[in-house]
Design a protein with these regions (language model features):
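Short, acidic/charged, Gly/Pro-enriched secondary-structure junctions
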Residues: 74-101
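Generic structural motif
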Residues: 6-9, 38, 66-70, 91-93, ...
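Exposed beta-sheet edge/beta-hairpin loop segments within beta-rich domains
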Residues: 71-80, 114-122
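Short, hydrophobic/proline-enriched secondary-structure or compact coil segments at domain edges
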Residues: 1-4, 61-63, 82-91
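Short acidic, glycine/tyrosine-flanked loop/strand segments centered on an H-E-D-like triad
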Residues: 60-64, 91-112
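Solvent-exposed edge beta-strands and adjacent loop segments
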Residues: 1-60, 105-120
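Mixed-charge, glycine-accented linear interaction segment located at domain edges/termini
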Residues: 105-151
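Oligomerization/assembly interface segments of phage tail-like spikes and tubes
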Residues: 49-70, 121-135
Length: 151
């Protein structure tokens, strides 16, 4: 999973066509996190505007980062203070990549940093980012992803 601020994402000069995004200037730094299996998720729920004939999307990204440390704490604080864009990877035989929050960004909805009681309990962060978008998530090619700098 990768995150950057919405303003940094916009500086990539994103171009949208046929449900995909390409980057004109892939120089923005994304924070990249390798997540444990079966502990993170994303969804992009289409939501009709009742009788108004409108449709919008409510994206949500929830992820868990194991182990508390100062570097992660500082990054979580930076991301929490900004509107962000997330790029997520699916768990398929051939993974696909999706950018979420590309128009309005995602805001921190809930965040928890702490340790559990039992030896097997989480010692780390659980973060949920949510947004409100006019369009669904967009595909990111592996070629464009390769051009992104990861922090």
């Amino acid at each position: 999973m990768r995150f950057c601020t919405l303003s940094d994402f916009e500086s990539l000069v994103p171009a949208f066509a046929t449900g995909a995004v390409t980057f004109g200037t892939p120089s923005t730094v994304f924070y990249k996190y390798e997540l444990d299996k079966e502990e993170s998720s994303f969804n992009d729920d289409p939501t009709p505007g009742s009788n108004k004939g409108t449709l919008y999307y409510v994206p949500a990204v929830t992820f868990i980062l194991s182990k508390l440390d100062v570097a992660k704490r500082n990054e979580m604080q930076l991301l929490a203070k900004n509107r962000v864009v997330a790029i997520v990877e699916t768990r398929e035989a051939t993974p696909t990549y999706w950018a979420i929050g590309v128009t309005n960004g995602l805001d921190l909805s809930t965040g928890v940093a702490g340790s559990g009681v039992a030896a097997a309990d989480l010692n780390g962060f659980t973060m949920t980012y949510m947004g409100l978008e006019p369009n669904p998530m967009v595909n990111v090619s592996s070629g464009d992803l390769a051009g992104i700098t990861n922090a």
